[in-house]
């Protein structure tokens, strides 16, 4: 199958939640926008060709055993091959001739054949307009989310936990042990790298690195380990002595620094453990052989080494979620029994069990809770991973800001794990968290201020729910060669979030014209329970009244306050002022001089095409692509907004915007209109025409 070019267009009859005999018809477009070994991303668009709809469920059967692992803009459940996507609270209504879209990540093995048919609200796709069966009552409408998510109160857990320091845990006290592990840090892309420690670009781990991480306030370290390439054949699967000794060395170094240390079977999950449903004996023998050796190595260590059974467990060849839950239960249960039977410190060591795909959907959580209820072991913890609302995490579909979608996804995920586990005495470790596209090698993919708001919210919402968080750092946060943070301000706010809230604002940027009069600008303050204390530039406090005013949560910067730090108004950031609050980290506000960006004609190919762009101090936020009929062009054809960096990227040094081969791989011959959105609010329109592998572009 050619990725991204497959679309299934089907007409369906719809049941209506508002009328028993409504005329209904719809069209469904299913497209795979990205495919990788064992995984894929799909997008689904439903066009309502009949009467308005309020409340919908779209169902289909996967013909090749595919499984959904993560969804957005819909709640997806599965039973065997059958999959059902139900509306979110905010997209239940589909107007006549309106559309609704959702997407998901999934797993596949062998082939990734598209579904052959869909049903909507129980009606088989028929291609015509017909009367729906008698509907079920319409669900209650959900209240509209607030427009300012960072100021909205979170849905409270059943009891607000104390913010006082946790006492020293005693052996066998799982809740106290996990609390003592907060905050945690991942030694990512190191021992999980394939095949060796430095294969993915990070330097060898040193005692100096571990000492530095500990000095920055982290109390636990997760050391992901991939064992696949470091053991012998069946039946013993003997781990290479040098590899096991190196793992033990780094664990011991970490313990000497005072860390709790979590180790696991990492990329083994998709390299061979995923085949367990089809070859239970071979996979289980290998799995138990490895854990028997690992458990034996650390049997007599202190309670601070912690074992995690499997990273992001996933399976192929199953009939659906119910079977996935069962096989994961078997592996988790065998892991617990094996470690406990090894004796010594392992008899009471904290063991960490993941949900399916380490996903926080309620079905995954409930399945793992069943395992906990069966095991009745007091020294267990649950783990999930959190990378935020997917469009924001990768900057696609216009997901450029920390908005209500992002906030609701965060709060919903953390509430579910709190209510399922923590409120019942089972501790939870967010074993990995970050944003997927935030990386020092992809500058601008995630706007800095929006990421700061995400960091602040993760820290707060995890803290009040007693969740321990472990930052996924594959080198994008800490420069391991120089032992310094790549962005000190990001670390400072993260550290502050471990103990208190910080105020933020609607933006960390204020744009002023390169020439011409500067006028006053306003920002909305997100106080987050703090009080605003004033503005500073360096060591100088700005004067209330002359330099700024505050009315409610509206901060107004006067023309004089902006003119002075802007200086000669060179393109770009001319100065940074800070908003200070009664607690937490200050909020940076960059004063940026810019003019509207301009672009010029270009020629190239589908493998090499760059648009000459004079940015004039501005920064690119996102790009839209449309065909002449207004439909989305290029990959992810469920949205006009393309994915930052994967489909396009700015090159500020070369004064160009690069359109990637992955973008052109799914662009049809003909004319495409591109709209570039910049953080100042400016937009440019550019036209490209593809003919085979030749591409021409211009502003008209």
Across the structure, where does each feature detected by a protein language model lie?
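A mature extracytoplasmic/lumenal domain signature
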Residues: 89, 106, 189, 225-227, ...
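Short, exposed coil/turn segments at beta-strand boundaries within extracellular/luminal domains
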Residues: 579-589, 677-686
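Active-site mouth of glycoside hydrolases
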Residues: 172-350, 354-362
């Amino acid at each position: 199958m050619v990725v991204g070019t497959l679309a299934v267009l089907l007409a369906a009859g719809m049941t209506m939640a508002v009328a028993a005999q409504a005329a209904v018809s719809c069209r469904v477009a299913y497209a795979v926008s990205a495919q990788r070994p064992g995984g894929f991303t799909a997008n689904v668009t439903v066009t309502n060709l009949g009467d308005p709809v309020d409340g919908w469920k779209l169902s289909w059967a996967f013909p090749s055993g595919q499984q959904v692992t993560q969804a957005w803009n819909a709640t997806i459940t599965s039973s065997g091959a059958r999959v059902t996507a139900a509306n979110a609270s905010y997209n239940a209504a589909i107007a006549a001739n309106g559309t609704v879209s959702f997407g998901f990540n999934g797993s596949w093995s062998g082939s990734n054949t598209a579904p052959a048919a869909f049903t909507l609200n129980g009606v088989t796709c028929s291609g015509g307009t017909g009367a729906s069966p008698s509907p079920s009552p319409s669900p209650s409408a959900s209240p509209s989310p607030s427009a300012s998510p960072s100021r909205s109160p979170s849905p409270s857990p059943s009891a607000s936990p104390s913010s006082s320091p946790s006492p020293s845990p005693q052996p066998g006290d799982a809740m106290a042990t996990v609390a003592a592990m907060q905050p945690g840090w991942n030694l990512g892309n190191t021992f999980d790298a394939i095949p060796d420690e430095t294969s993915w670009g990070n330097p060898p781990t040193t005692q100096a690195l571990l000492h530095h991480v500990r000095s920055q306030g982290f109390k636990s370290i997760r050391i992901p380990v991939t064992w696949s390439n470091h053991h012998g054949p069946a039946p013993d699967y003997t781990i290479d002595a040098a590899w096991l000794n190196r793992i033990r060395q780094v664990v011991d170094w970490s313990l000497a620094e005072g860390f709790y240390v979590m180790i696991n079977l990492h990329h083994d999950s998709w390299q061979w453990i995923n085949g367990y449903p089809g070859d239970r004996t071979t996979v289980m023998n290998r799995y138990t052989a490895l854990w028997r050796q690992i458990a034996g190595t650390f049997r007599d260590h202190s309670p601070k080494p912690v074992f995690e059974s499997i990273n992001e467990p996933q399976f192929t060849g199953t009939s659906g979620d119910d079977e996935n839950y069962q096989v994961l239960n078997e592996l988790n249960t065998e892991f617990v029994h094996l470690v406990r039977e090894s004796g010594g410190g392992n008899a009471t060591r904290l063991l960490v069990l993941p949900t399916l795909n380490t996903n926080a959907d309620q079905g995954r959580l409930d399945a793992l809770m069943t395992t906990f209820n069966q095991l009745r072991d007091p020294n267990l913890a649950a783990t999930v991973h959190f990378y935020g609302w997917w469009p924001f995490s990768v900057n696609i579909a216009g997901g450029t800001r920390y908005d209500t979608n992002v906030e609701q996804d965060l709060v919903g995920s953390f509430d579910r794990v709190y209510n399922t586990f923590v409120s019942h005495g089972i501790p939870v470790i967010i074993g990995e968290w970050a944003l997927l596209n935030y990386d020092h090698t992809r500058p601008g993919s995630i706007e800095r201020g929006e990421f700061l708001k995400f960091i602040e919210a993760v820290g707060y919402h995890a803290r009040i729910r007693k969740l321990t968080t472990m930052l996924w750092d594959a080198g994008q946060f800490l420069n391991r060669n120089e032992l310094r943070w790549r962005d000190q301000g990001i670390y400072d706010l993260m550290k502050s979030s471990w103990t208190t809230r910080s105020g933020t604002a609607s933006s960390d940027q204020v744009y002023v014209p390169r020439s011409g009069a500067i006028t006053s600008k306003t920002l909305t303050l997100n106080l987050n329970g703090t009080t605003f204390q004033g503005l500073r530039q360096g060591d100088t406090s700005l004067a209330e009244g002359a330099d700024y005013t505050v009315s409610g949560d509206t901060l107004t910067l006067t023309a004089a306050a902006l003119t002075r730090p802007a200086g000669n108004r060179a393109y770009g950031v001319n100065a940074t002022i800070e908003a200070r609050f009664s607690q937490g980290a200050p909020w940076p506000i960059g004063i940026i001089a810019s003019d509207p960006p301009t672009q010029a004609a270009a020629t190239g190919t589908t493998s090499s095409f760059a648009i000459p762009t004079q940015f004039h101090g501005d920064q690119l936020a996102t790009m839209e692509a449309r065909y002449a009929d207004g439909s989305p062009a290029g990959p992810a054809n469920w949205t006009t907004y393309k994915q930052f960096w994967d489909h396009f990227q700015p090159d500020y040094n070369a004064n160009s915007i690069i359109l990637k081969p992955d973008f052109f791989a799914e662009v049809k011959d003909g004319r495409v209109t591109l709209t570039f959105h910049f953080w100042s609010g400016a937009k440019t329109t550019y036209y490209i025409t593809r003919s085979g592998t030749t591409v021409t572009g211009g502003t008209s």
